[in-house]
Regions:
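Conserved Walker A/P-loop ATP-binding site and its immediately adjacent core
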Residues: 63, 71-94, 107, 198
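Conserved helicase motor
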Residues: 81, 101-113, 280-284, 303-319, ...
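C-terminal helicase lobe and adjacent C-terminal extensions/tails of nucleic-acid helicase motors
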Residues: 182, 263-273, 279, 284-291, ...
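Interdomain hinge/linker at the junction between the two RecA-like core domains of SF2 helicases
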Residues: 195-269
Length: 584
């Protein structure tokens, strides 16, 4: 990485206006990141409240750190494909297109021909954006598809954005891989979030001794000395207090809020706040609440629905419309799933959040009074909705709800976004789920996936090693690499991607269907990323039965019939009326 990259970023930062007091705080955060860039290599944390400008601040740290230590590239690992585009675009605008690579995983062809292998993305640019799914699959997934991405991770700076979204079952696998990269691969890492999870050894000091010893033995992050870039506890507390822009109220109702009750509460808030955002846990709740607002005659131009059933290009167009209305002080009501919580720069006067994990509540609060533009503090409401049991279908949300409710009660009347409350939440959360963190293998009595990749003590041949040690023979290697690769899935119900006929997506489908030259095909496929939707197995089967999904020329790439994509909800398992697609 050349000094020219640093100079371009410094010039851009110098141009930023300071319209609100928060802009001065963001500048100080970026300055602290620059100051700490000269530190020794290692694993660092960057704990910054939502809206603190951590994307460019972490880039500033990484560029100068890479230049200081002669590192080759910066790799941004982001939780969702839905926010890669905007983060990459922000960096591309500063450094130039030739320096930035976006590597999505959702449209990689399922069939690995030799042409696919030759033309699939290499991480050969100075700055790479990818997902946590890609990172974990490279290390632990079966086959060779992801293995080519391991060596570029060495001698690099890895920035993990919203690290709290790391799946609980992957905690020990992730920690061991990252420790290896830093200790033996010559890399450095920065874990960015407003809600720092307890991934290091010091984070489990409050656990009972037996559980603390087990968790540490399985592997936790070996952080650098003075690892928090923003300083120690007192400095962090002051930063969060200075950036406090909202007041959070837990409005609990016995038996939970029904759709009609929650909808009526939303519209009551809308009468006094010009803009309202309601974030829910499931797509069904989002659709039902949106339809309630329609029935109550909320003007269609002011009402928005967002979910991952809409492709990225579709959501981007909706965000643009919302921002235009907000800038003009026009009314906005938005019903969204959790996708709006990560990396979306939008600011509402009022936010309502369905009860979820405390980290999710904090992220939702980051969409309220984001720039401190409103007099006084913004209002964030947390409601316990009437939902079916989420324990089996969405266990992370279910566990988060339980522990968040506990902390909300314990810290009643206090700022629950303060680091002390968040730390208490994660202590409860990780203690409750500590047995899951080594990736327990379903329907197996032979330990966890971490066991399979380490000493594998449950292996039937393990007893032979005791005999070999007694006779001073080398032990047999017991690792079950192949079985571990087959069993590993970042997402329990892995999705499959389909290109949808929204906007330019329709023309790209036609081009892909008529293109036989591999390089050109991959070019169109890269453009089609923004027009793809990830589909869960049960919905995929229903679409197949309806003849709504078609494969492109035996390539393992699929597209959707336009009768199954709507302007309001995106991809629909049931057929919708034919529609025209307009550029928004």
């Amino acid at each position: 990485l050349a000094s020219g990259h640093c100079n371009k970023l410094e010039a851009k930062l110098a141009q930023f206006e300071r319209r609100y007091p928060i802009d001065e705080i963001r500048r100080q955060i970026a300055d602290d990141c620059l100051q700490r860039a000269a530190d020794a290599q290692g694993i660092y944390t960057l704990t910054v409240p939502t809206g603190g400008g951590k994307t460019l601040a972490s880039l500033r740290h990484a560029l100068h750190h890479a230049q200081t230590h002669g590192l080759e590239r910066i790799i941004y690992i982001i939780p969702y494909t839905s926010i890669i585009d905007q983060n990459a675009e922000a960096v591309r605008d500063i450094l130039g297109d030739e320096w930035v690579l976006e590597h999505h995983s959702n449209l990689d062809p399922e069939k690995q021909t030799w042409q696919n292998k030759l033309l699939s993305e290499n991480w050969n640019k100075p700055i790479v954006f990818t997902t946590m799914v890609q990172f974990l699959d490279a290390w632990f997934g079966g086959g060779t598809r992801g293995a080519r991405h391991i060596h570029p991770m060495a001698n690099s700076v890895l920035i993990f954005d919203e690290i709290q979204t790391l799946p609980v079952k992957c905690v020990h696998l992730f920690c061991n891989a990252l420790n290896w990269l830093v200790q033996f691969g010559g890399s450095s890492a920065v874990l960015c979030t407003a809600t720092q999870p307890l991934l290091s050894a010091c984070g489990v000091d409050e656990f009972p001794e037996d559980k603390r010893a087990l968790v540490k033995a399985r592997g936790l992050l070996q952080l650098a000395s003075n690892a928090e870039i923003m300083g120690k506890n007192q400095a962090l507390d002051k930063l969060f207090a200075d950036l406090s822009r909202v007041e959070i109220k837990f409005n609990e109702k016995a038996g939970g809020w029904s759709v009609d009750e929650a909808g009526a509460f939303l519209l009551t808030q809308f009468q006094t706040a010009l803009s309202c955002l309601f974030i829910v846990n499931t797509k069904k709740w989002a659709k039902d609440l949106y339809q309630y607002c329609q029935q109550q005659n909320v003007p269609s131009e002011a009402l928005f629905h967002l979910s991952t059933n809409q492709c990225a290009a579709h959501r981007k167009a909706l965000f643009a419309r919302m921002k235009q209305r907000l800038e003009k002080k026009l009314p906005v009501v938005c019903i969204s799933t959790q996708l709006i919580e990560a990396g979306v720069d939008i600011s509402m006067a009022c936010v309502i959040r369905a009860l979820g994990g405390l980290d999710s509540i904090a992220q939702a609060a980051g969409r309220c009074n984001r720039h401190g533009e409103n007099a006084g503090k913004g209002r964030v409401w947390v409601l316990n909705l009437q939902e079916p049991s989420l324990a089996k279908v969405l266990p992370d949300i279910d566990a988060g709800q339980q522990q968040a409710e506990r902390v909300l009660r314990e810290f009643a009347g206090q700022d629950i976004l303060q680091p002390k409350a968040m730390r208490q939440y994660f202590e409860y959360y990780f203690y409750q789920r500590s047995d899951e963190m080594a990736y327990a293998v379903k329907n197996s009595a032979s330990g966890s996936l971490l066991d399979w990749l380490s000493d594998n003590g449950y292996n039937n041949y393990a007893a032979k090693n005791d005999q070999r040690r007694q006779t001073k023979q080398y032990p047999l290697l017991m690792h079950s690499f192949k079985s571990a690769g087959r069993a590993f899935q970042v997402i329990d119900a892995p999705t499959r991607a389909v290109i949808v006929p929204y906007g330019e997506g329709k023309a790209l489908i036609a081009k892909l269907c008529g293109e036989y030259e591999p390089k050109a095909f991959y070019g169109y496929l890269n453009q089609a990323q923004r027009f793809s939707v990830n589909v869960f197995p049960n919905v995929w089967e229903k679409l197949i039965e309806s003849n709504a999904i078609h494969e492109i020329a035996d390539t393992g790439v699929y597209y959707l019939n336009e009768r199954h994509y709507s302007e309001e909800y995106g991809l629909a398992a049931d057929e919708v009326a034919p529609m025209d697609f307009y550029d928004l």
